[in-house]
Amino acid sequence: MTKNLFHYLTLCVLALSLVACGSDDDGSNPTPTVTNANRNIVTANVPKEITRLEFPHLRGGDNIVIVHKTDNNTKINYSVEWDYGKKSPRWSCFPMTNGSSKGGVGRNGPFEEDPDLPSSMRFSDTNSMFTGSGYDRGHMCASYDRQYSKEANHQTFYYTNMQPQRNAFNAGSNYDGLWVQMENFVQNRAKSLKDGDTIYVCKGGTIDSESMILERIKGQLIVPKYFFMALLEKNANGYKALAFWTEHLNHTVPNAHLADYAITIDALEEKTGIDFFCNLPDDTEDKVEKSLSLISWAL
């Protein structure tokens, strides 16, 4: 009796195993596949941080990526793609949280050469290029984007984070320049974030087409004709994106209506040739980059 019961139980287990195997193979509950065809790939020649969400797709060629960190090289500050053929930054990218602009450390200059950029890849004296040019040293990652730490703030004064800007466009005579108003928007937005939420920012000026270059200081240092900001906000509800695009103006815009300069990330990519937020899954990237809700950004 015991032997027959053993054989019966064995047959039941075998039958259940066959049914289970059949269920696994029938495709009724497949594992979802996340595609990310245009993501940055880490190689021996680039830093591992290029897979972070604030990074655009790297251009390659005569370009290097410099990542600046603080707190004994443990905390991301900002990153730059530097075109050493043009001796110009293409963009600076960085995260903003509700603590980024808090702390009140002020401006911790002076402006100086980036210690992480080989001297062969830059002008021998970038300061002299700006001096007497009539252009401001325009921050991409702003000094007031980094008020939580003197070390982080000081790094924003590296010339790799600067592009020439007209004063009326940059700060203006009474902080009424368009650029500083866009910066204020990002800073105020970040301050309102909940803990754990982040705005991923990429900012720069156009350097890749002669039609988008205003002039060259001393025939060398590129002055962009247009400037941009690409913003990706991540919170408990998911992602949303916004871009600003503007001509390099020669006048102030008091109380600017920033919605007039807002476009989709897709539109910004068309204008710049830069693939922003490439490390998002493709379906998420496609959705957020073609969408623009001014109301959700309080514009």
Language-model regions, residue ranges each:
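Domain-level detector for secreted/extracellular nuclease and nuclease-toxin modules, and
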Residues: 22-299
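A ubiquitous, low-specificity "background" feature that marks scattered single residues
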Residues: 10-13, 145
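Residue-level signal for mature regions of secreted extracellular proteins and peptides
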Residues: 14-15, 159
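Bacterial N-terminal signal peptides that target proteins for export
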Residues: 1-9
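C-terminal motif of bacterial Sec signal peptides marking the signal peptidase cleavage site
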Residues: 17-20
